[in-house]
Amino acid sequence: MALVRDDFDDIPDSEIHETIVERIEGLGEMFPDALRSAVHSTVDWSIWGVKGVFSLTKSTIWVVSTTSLIAFLPYIIEKERSDLEKTQVAQQRQMLLGPSAAIQQAKTA
């Protein structure tokens, strides 16, 4: 069995620059085709699953946030308006009857 030398053997190892992708591709050739295709299929299905879960999560968050905004915003606005009216009535009462009336009403409420 004779060894055949080519030009690649004359290049020193310190001058060979290969990327990580090239190195992984070269290492992948040492595994059987069945194993490589199984790993490739598993990775593809995993990526598909993660994309699906991400898309479902985005849609769910959008539906929940817009629904809660539509449902609770009128309540929040009405409560704020009611609190403002109560504050205005208390201020008017204080102006008309003096500070003691406002304190007395606060104790009874």
UniProtKB/Swiss-Prot annotation:
Annotated organism of origin: Caenorhabditis elegans
Compartments in which it is found: Mitochondrion outer membrane
Membrane topology (Cytoplasmic): 1-60
Regions crossing the membrane: 61-77
Intervals, Mitochondrial intermembrane compartment: 78-109
Keywords noted in UniProt: Membrane, Mitochondrion, Mitochondrion outer membrane, Protein transport, Receptor, Translocation, Transmembrane, Transmembrane helix, Transport
Membrane topology value: Single-pass membrane protein
Designated name of the protein: Mitochondrial import receptor subunit TOM22 homolog
